[in-house]
Amino acid sequence: MKTKLKPILTSLLLACGTAMAQTNDCASLTHQALDLSGFNLTIDYMTSALASDQFIQQLRGRQDSEQFFNAIQPVLKKEFSGEILRRELQNRVAALCNAEQMRQTVEKLQSPFIARMLALEAATNSAEGQAKLQRYINIAQTAPPTDDRMEALEKLDESAGVSDFVTDFQMAMFTGILTGAGAPKEILDQIPLRRREMKAQRQNYVELGMSVTYHGVTRPELLQYAGELSTPPLKGFYSLVRKTFVEIVGERSQAMGRDLKPIIAPPTS
């Protein structure tokens, strides 16, 4: 009997060892991919934007400004800490990853052409880059890129899913906050109906921003980049990361809504 059990135990040990190795590989590879792709830097930029007076004003509505500001600051810090969001995103993506596919993603992100484009995006996401971006977007609004270049930028936006991601992020946040605060169903049901309008409002800004970010990049290169982002392994990686991040934002926004309910919930009588 013991002799018969040995092959079974050996197989189980090998399977456990393989699973542990893949788990460790996925954690390391996911960390690399999130760093190389610039998504961790994007999280830092987003959390900084959430703490801005402009964003808080959007949420405040007709509430007393000082009371709302004092209430929301610690809640934002707790639920939307960049460090916590990066760690949670990495853990969730790593739990869903295929080690070989993630290895291919890391290799692709390190390829010369993709690395060059990512470097341009990283420069834009810096504090200095954001200030420059806003200045040049204002100029681009009065003197927009040529039709051919805008067509290439639209194709890149479609492949990269940037406008969709920005829209989904904002919808998840507002839906989460209102859900947590106990908003009535008829109000929550209106949010998905506004998605097309919300995306249209952001798309022009996103694509003008791209024209600044990729200034000096030729039209064929923009189309090449769009092609890379719309095929494996990058397509699967970015889709997974963005979907997972939007889910995290929705969950944390609900928690934020519950914390803010005493000051943003409508009176019951």
Pin down the residues of each PLM region.
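Bacterial N-terminal signal peptides that target proteins for export
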Residues: 1-9
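N-terminal signal peptide c-region/cleavage motif recognized by signal peptidases
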Residues: 16-21
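Immediate post-signal-peptide N-terminus of mature secreted/exported proteins
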Residues: 22-56, 142-165
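N-terminal, post-signal-peptide region of Sec/Tat-exported proteins
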Residues: 44-81
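Acidic/His-rich structured neighborhood in mature extracellular/periplasmic domains
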Residues: 75, 79-155, 159
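Extended amphipathic alpha-helical interaction segments
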Residues: 123-215, 219
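A cross-kingdom marker for long, charged
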Residues: 199-200, 204-269
